[in-house]
């Protein structure tokens, strides 16, 4: 990934309503290469909604988003089918993206080698979460949008993800993540909803 000085994402004046209730108004942010922004707020404050908006999955009621960088989105649902093994899951995504990344190396990096051929219905929540994050390594995209990335991860899983995140930031990538507990996360800035 080539390091650039242009923002990987910028947003201004964002507003969103849920029914008649204003979740947030006037939110703005700029994300440069190597930065990590954490979205904070109580349950129901709109963190996931804002992330989905930044990913282009929903539209704001007001405001503008410039997202010149290709991005990865990892939400609450891992997207792994019950019959799909981690190896098959990654192979399908690799084919869809035209990736030549080593699936075996990625499985090893996220401690999924022993579970590589276990159907999704039998994986633990942490194994499913790590499988979802393995997709991040299939194709280099500078911008990662992560919804509660540490959910279901034990201490070892969190350490593995921290290493993946640190490597991404070191190479000029950037991250926006919603989190309740950002301990150990390389926070550049916070947005509180």
From Swiss-Prot:
Residues the record lists as binding ATP: 41-48
Annotated ranges, domain ABC transporter: 9-191
Main location: membrane
Localization terms from the record: Cell inner membrane
Catalytic activity: heme b(in) + ATP + H2O = heme b(out) + ADP + phosphate + H(+)
EC number: 7.6.2.5
Pfam families listed in its UniProt record: ABC_tran (PF00005)
Membrane topology designation: Peripheral membrane protein
InterPro entries for this protein: AAA+_ATPase, ABC_transporter-like_ATP-bd, ABC_transptr_haem_export_CcmA, P-loop_NTPase
Gene Ontology cellular component list: plasma membrane
Keywords of this entry: ATP-binding, Cell inner membrane, Cell membrane, Cytochrome c-type biogenesis, Membrane, Nucleotide-binding, Translocase, Transport
GO molecular function, one term: ATP hydrolysis activity
Subunit structure and binding partners: The complex is composed of two ATP-binding proteins (CcmA) and two transmembrane proteins (CcmB).
Job description of the protein: Part of the ABC transporter complex CcmAB involved in the biogenesis of c-type cytochromes; once thought to export heme, this seems not to be the case, but its exact role is uncertain. Responsible for energy coupling to the transport system.
UniProt similarity note: Belongs to the ABC transporter superfamily. CcmA exporter (TC 3.A.1.107) family.
Name of this chain's protein: Cytochrome c biogenesis ATP-binding export protein CcmA
Organism: Hyphomonas neptunium (strain ATCC 15444)
Gene that produces this protein: ccmA
